Amino acid sequence: RTSSRHQDFKDAVAVQFALGDVLLHTHGHNEPFFGMGNRGKVVNIWQWRADWQTEIETKEKIEYATKGMDLDAMIFGGEVNPVDALNPFRDNPVEELNAEGFGTLTPQPRTKQNVLGKGVWKDGHWSVVLYRTLDSLNKWDKQFMNDQPILVAFAIWDGYEQDRNGRKVVSMWQRLHLP
């Protein structure tokens, strides 16, 4: 669950799709690395964050576990952070990103953010739904086509276990078949 205390870590979930024409476990393993892709093998990531949803629903700014000591706060100055005020994603708890390996995670521009979602906390567990139209004109989005398997992987951040950034539970690639 998400709280507004800075010492609490936040819950999140991400779904990752391999871009391009790749198949799981083909000769030569042409699929990207399941941990955020690798050079030349870009992945499309949809991340839902419980803290963003709480901010949207309560209109209350959440403190972070870094207690304002992250790079933005050091560069732009603590509580009054002009970069934070311009954050375009706070009307949606989901952010769409791309990566091609560690250290390359990049949010898509605001005009390309087309994934929506919502999480519901009930009986000590989150249920999260992420969605967008099947087709997309953005070349950095996964193109969903009927009768073609899709490579999908998942990541879960459990704030109670102090998960954050690269500390998370991840799955290997799975095949998803759309009817």
List each language-model region with its residue ranges:
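Surface-exposed, low-complexity/disordered Ser/Thr/Gly/Pro/Asn-rich loops and linkers
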Residues: 85-110
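Acidic/polar low-complexity flexible segments
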Residues: 2-90, 122, 137-179
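Generic hydrophobic/packing signal
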Residues: 16, 111-112, 123-127
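Mature, soluble, non-transmembrane domains
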Residues: 62, 67, 105-106, 110-114, ...
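Beta-strand-rich interaction surfaces with strong enrichment in secreted/lumenal proteins
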Residues: 115-121
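A beta-strand/beta-hairpin structural motif
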Residues: 120, 127-136
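Glycine-centered flexibility motif
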Residues: 101-103, 125-127, 131, 147
